[in-house]
């Protein structure tokens, strides 16, 4: 499995990123709302709710403002669309709510959904409320605080949960219309091309080459499943003491599509992310890419994974498009976090990495 040269550097160190994204903060002025109106809505729509209500804003969450709702008996989480000018396909909190509402009864680890509000008059934008799941958020993929056996167990637990998602019968859950089966990769390339162009701040030759090459070289979609589309350790809650996923978070990008797009996005950590920088994965306790691929194939009944370099090129291109969208929101004044501006430097690095993978895939 070939790898591109030179890992793409993170915008900040993992410890800094954890500090920036862990815990709550005072509600940003641009994200304040009528808390009394929210409490009234909760009383009418959330079973078992009893005030008084205290609202705090979580740090991080650059896409959709996320709040901790504290009551004497129970804590909740609210996610809402940000105010201001928005890209048409972004911030789909209603889709998040729909998918966790479908998954929760099956036993798949998601937070219990309590209610969706599409009435902008309550807090200013659409929002939903779910339970607050307690446990560990693991920001550093290398898991420096853990012994090698637990590192291995945590990564394999995350992998099993992803395989469980891809093995789920979405039709039986009422999600047949959640996305369009077939041509997923082509549609995703088109989506992220449009987002990149809508938010473009500087011309990048590598992105232009990818925009031309990727649609012409798409592998055949061989399966349609639920895809999370942003699956990584820091988008899940791990049990407080066990190597077990208790909730997968941030379903904004979820749709029906090719599960290999999901899985190879996870694999990017092995080729140009934190895990790629570890010299001896086995000694560290983290599965090698070969082990991870073999186990995913075993869990999902595959004989192998073709054209990995094409998927790596696509995933780096896609991430460049996502980050360029954040850059655009900073420019337009709708970004949730001042740290979002730092992402701009990553876009050309990702574009160059994507083109290296594309060349290894035959471009």
Where are these regions (language model features)?
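Juxta-kinase regulatory segment immediately upstream of eukaryotic protein kinase catalytic domains
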Residues: 13-49
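Activation of the activation-loop gatekeeper triad in protein kinase-fold domains
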Residues: 249-254
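Hydrophobic residue at the +6 position relative to the catalytic HRD Asp in the kinase catalytic loop
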Residues: 236-238
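ATP-binding pocket architecture of kinase catalytic cores
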Residues: 52-226, 240-242
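Active-site activation/catalytic loop segments of kinase-like enzymes and analogous catalytic loops
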Residues: 261-300, 315-332
